[in-house]
């Protein structure tokens, strides 16, 4: 089994955070999120796919991951390229921006994998934040948009035994300043929270249509 | 054991949804969410606390719940009043706006309750969307604000055996049009989704700092 983590290039990274974090800080945020994810994946083989050499170097030397230099456009193609370059059939695909994922989740997935062909956990907004496939070519990958529903549709169409893994912590992907709030609530002892705290970021509760957090920077 | 559901008055209800749903529709949304929650609680005794007679009538006659007419201001006081009016020690407290909760979650909580004094599941934004207490006066209730952290603090202070129950579906509370999006993704076979569909509401994916969904009404 291999865990595949596709990573967007640093310069296109998290532009929705750009009012809040400089480009250098967004890069460091990404690297810290990858450190947290790697910790959850302890003992498993990790493959990082990216077109960005700085990320690939980090993945290789610090995360001790296999690396795949992305050749084609689009997330689905990047993952398929990684599929082609590994021998393993069994894969888990996770994004680079879910730093609240824990070892416990992966242990659950490995247990469930004995009984299911496909295991999926959603992001907020109908995306896919974890996808386990007993065999990498079982379905057509359909990331982007409401991929959670599309992947379930694939599973149904092919009569796969599938399981929906319900996790709030996996659902939290970091795209907006608002999202950083969840790191402050749930991210104790993560690299990501420690990094953000070091930048002087603080979070307060709010309840309005504009969101659930006030995220500020000292 | 009793499950306590505090419910705000209908006229103060979900004002953040008011651009999108009329007052009558927001009321019906609430009643449908309560129907979904009641389904998840099948077989358990439910107590609805509210100052609103229409809600209390619905709770009594349709949900077959015990009812408590709220006398004091504030969510914590409403729950404490319910504590006073029941004989049971063991309680689960859940809000009225988490229609994606499932029977499976409650079964998990009941199993875990053998080993823990306090079980908590967070909302998005650091609130508390499920709280199990082995004995109702074990902690000081501290709803409002980042109550998830405050309740954990209470548990630590008193050396309770506590468990953080990680569920995306429980984390989804319905406060904004954006939140309705999650119902469309995850709410198949719920009263709530069926009701919203009947109103001509539709949801599309979006990825911007303004949110993850485009929620429209035909």
UniProtKB/Swiss-Prot annotation, chains A, B:
Database matches in Pfam families: CofC
A molecular function GO annotation: GTP binding
Gene3D superfamilies reported in the protein's UniProt record: Spore Coat Polysaccharide Biosynthesis Protein SpsA, Chain A
UniProt xrefs under SUPFAM superfamilies: Nucleotide-diphospho-sugar transferases (SSF53448)
Keyword Plastid among UniProt keywords: no
UniProt enzyme class: transferase
Catalytic activity of the protein: (2S)-2-phospholactate + GTP + H(+) = (2S)-lactyl-2-diphospho-5'-guanosine + diphosphate
EC code: 2.7.7.68
Pathway, per record: Cofactor biosynthesis; coenzyme F420 biosynthesis
Family from the record: Belongs to the CofC family.
Cited function: Guanylyltransferase that catalyzes the activation of (2S)-2-phospholactate (2-PL) as (2S)-lactyl-2-diphospho-5'-guanosine, via the condensation of 2-PL with GTP. It is involved in the biosynthesis of coenzyme F420, a hydride carrier cofactor.
NCBIfam families: F420_cofC (TIGR03552)
Subunit structure: Homodimer.
Descriptive protein name: 2-phospho-L-lactate guanylyltransferase
Species per Swiss-Prot/TrEMBL record: Methanocaldococcus fervens (strain DSM 4213 / JCM 15782 / AG86) (Methanococcus fervens)
Encoding gene (name): cofC
């Amino acid at each position: 089994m291999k865990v595949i983590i596709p990573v967007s290039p640093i310069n296109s990274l998290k532009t929705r955070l750009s009012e809040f974090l400089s480009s250098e800080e967004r890069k460091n945020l990404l690297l810290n999120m990858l450190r947290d994810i790697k910790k959850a994946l302890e003992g498993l083989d990790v493959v990082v796919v990216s077109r960005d050499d700085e990320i690939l170097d980090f993945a290789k030397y610090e995360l001790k991951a296999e690396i795949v230099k992305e050749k084609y456009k689009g997330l689905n193609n990047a993952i398929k390229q990684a599929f082609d370059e590994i021998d393993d059939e069994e894969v888990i695909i996770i994004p680079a921006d879910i730093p609240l994922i824990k070892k416990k989740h992966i242990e659950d997935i490995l247990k469930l994998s004995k009984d299911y062909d496909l295991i999926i956990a959603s992001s907020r907004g109908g995306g896919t934040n974890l996808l386990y496939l007993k065999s990498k070519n079982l379905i057509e990958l359909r990331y982007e948009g409401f991929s959670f529903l599309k992947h379930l549709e694939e599973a149904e169409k092919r009569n796969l035994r599938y399981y929906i893994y319900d996790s709030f912590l996996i659902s939290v992907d970091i795209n907006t300043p608002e999202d950083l709030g969840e790191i402050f609530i749930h991210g104790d002892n993560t690299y990501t929270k420690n990094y953000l705290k070091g930048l002087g970021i603080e979070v307060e509760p709010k309840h309005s249509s504009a969101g659930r957090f006030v995220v500020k920077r000292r």
